[in-house]
Every structure is written in structure tokens, then in C-alpha cells.
């Protein structure tokens, strides 16, 4: 019996480092504040691209990062009520002709001389509108407390098909954060 237990412990110890490496994006200082347009999120992400991802970007493969936000209200009689669910996609690419990295979201584009500068900008998410100023339609009210959740991930589904196949089960392509969950009391709306 002790031999069997020892075998299980060794297997568990072999798995733990893989689990630690799976969540490579850290989330710090998430905040929700009121603005003229509604409620916005500000958050800092901490991550680095591994050698394989750096090489892929430098050789022209576009990487798509997705920030996901959810806000729920607890209910005693059923599952929590999901009030808000938003996603924002960031496109990181390299242009060999200009030798610049480009970070895009929606119709906004910004160019950088180095990959580290582009990643620094990507790691600082500011003024992301998650709740429109007509918050009542979403079912949220200032002064009430809600559960907010946020994560960032590399979206391998938007990679070119050969890279999607190579990314399956490959930890080099698994760049994601755990959900950061916190309680937030919505401030009064800005005028």
C-alpha cells in the first residue's frame, strides 16, 4: 500500500509544474470606474511571449489576444444571473517592410518599433467600456455589489489552420490567465 501511495504522489508532483505553467498571464489591479459613456475597466496584465510565439509573430503570424469580462449577480434560488458579458480582441502583427509591430483593436491601430513596446501596451488595458451609460437595461445599478470576472487569453482559434493543429496540446501556444474574480460595488455614474 505505501508503494502505491508513493507512486500516486510522484505522479501528482509531475503534474503540478505543468499546471503552474498553464496560466502564464497574471492579472493585477482590476478596477471598474464610472465614465461619461458608462462603466469602464482598467487592468494590468503581466506576461511574456515564449520563444515560439515571438518567432511566429516575427515571421508574420498574427496573434489574437482576447480579453473577456463578465458581471453576475448572485441568486439564492438559482444559478447566478449573468448581467454583462463582453470580449475585446487585440491583433498583434509584425510588418517586415516597415520593421514595426502593430497592435490593433477594432478600427484602432498603433505601431511600435519593438515587440516589448507592443506587449507593454497590450498589458495595460484602460478605458474599456463594459457597461453602456444606460446601465439599467443591463440590470445593474450604482451602489449595488456584483461579482466581476476578467481574463485574457491567446485565441488559437483565430490562428491560421496549420498553427491551430500544431497548437492543440502544445503548452507553447497555451497563453492564458485564470479568471480573476472580485466583488465590485458600482460607483455613481459620472455626469
List each model region and its residues.
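Bacterial N-terminal signal peptides that target proteins for export
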Residues: 1-12
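A short, structured loop/turn motif at beta-sheet edges
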Residues: 34-39, 94-99, 138-147
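Short, well-ordered beta-strand segments enriched in hydrophobic/aromatic residues
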Residues: 39-49
